[in-house]
Amino acid sequence: MQLLGNRNGVFPRRLATQDYFIQDPRYLQCYADMFCRFIDLYKAEGLPITKVMYQNEAYSYTPYPGCPWTAEGAQRFNNDYLAPTLRKHHPEVELWFGTINTNRLDYVERTLDNEQLQSNIVGIGTQWECRDNLPQLRKRYPKLRLMMSESECGNGAMDWKAGEHTFFLLSDNLGNGVDEY
């Protein structure tokens, strides 16, 4: 897999053609149940969870261990397992879709155009390359809120230039309709 060089403005270069999360109902329900278990455990420590997203960077096809999902797998898990389980055990917790870290708008739309999914989520969590899609997402899904779910840490310099970049990201995201960070 080529990881360096020109990406032709697209991230990731390749999308997963299969779900890396095992699509057996037992595993899917167990994963949904674990969300509720973590919500319970955090609440017991005085840390209420108000919103969840099913997977960080679910569209990164990486050489290191990750968990890419197909559009169909993401819809299946969120619609058939996570949303109903949250409604039953934690109706106070919002379900957001994300985090979306790809600028492959065609793929994002293929996932989010599912009406059942739209009715199950409150908003869309975006980060990194997905920032390129914010105007289109805002227009296509006006009832869904947008969240900047992660900031770009770059190379970790933590210097003034990195601070300026983070300020730019916040400004750009807010200017494109993001109302959560």
Please tell me what each predicted stretch does.
Residues 1-109:
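Substrate-binding cleft and catalytic face of glycoside hydrolase catalytic domains
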Residues 36-38, 79-81, 101-114, 130-136, ...:
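Alpha-helical scaffolding within the catalytic cores
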Residues 59-76, 106-125, 154-168:
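Short flexible/disordered coil segments
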